[in-house]
Swiss-Prot record:
It catalyses: dTMP + ATP = dTDP + ADP. This is Thymidylate kinase. Phosphorylation of dTMP to form dTDP in both de novo and salvage pathways of dTTP synthesis. It comes from Francisella philomiragia subsp. philomiragia (strain ATCC 25017 / CCUG 19701 / FSC 153 / O#319-036). Its EC number is 2.7.4.9.
Amino acid sequence: MSKFIVIEGLDGAGKSTAIGFIKKYLDSKSLAAVYTREPGGTKVAEELRSIVLHNDYDEEIHPDSELLMIYAGRIQHYRNLIAPALTKGVNVVSDRFYWSSIAYQGGGRELGVDKLNVLNETFLKDCQPDLIIYLDIDPAIGLARAGKVGSPDRIEKAGLAFFDRTRAVFKSLVAANHNAYEIDASQSIDVIEKEIYAILDKYF
């Protein structure tokens, strides 16, 4: 049976590297998978991603607008890419899903987790990942890592207090969900790889 796997974490936590390990694992077992990301994943969702992260317009994006654009993209992503793949028996691995909105917008932007829960219950009730791996990193370290890769986007410019709030929500979500696992992303790459494989062994 196909699995929906989500990698979560702050910017600079090493999600792309972790997804590479998951791909290596699934390939070793000859298991088909689609690899995708949020915000984005489909043409429409990628357009919304560009607005949310870069905003080339001379107009401030209100936090509520940011949230709803992300959810519009997420609905497109799930209905047009994720759900069809799972129906065909293909595994899906996503760099972020709705936990990122709960943590970043609900916590970081201080919009409130209750508002996010209403959106999830209304639009994504049947969109539950089978496995969520959260990579935990100190925000200062994560932002320093992300800064070495490229220019910071709108969200990466939000400041340490924003990311401290975001991290706290992520950790509370892990604690409340039986299908979620936290990995210390400050460990060596080899240790992280082994921990990811140990988690995947429980599902495949």
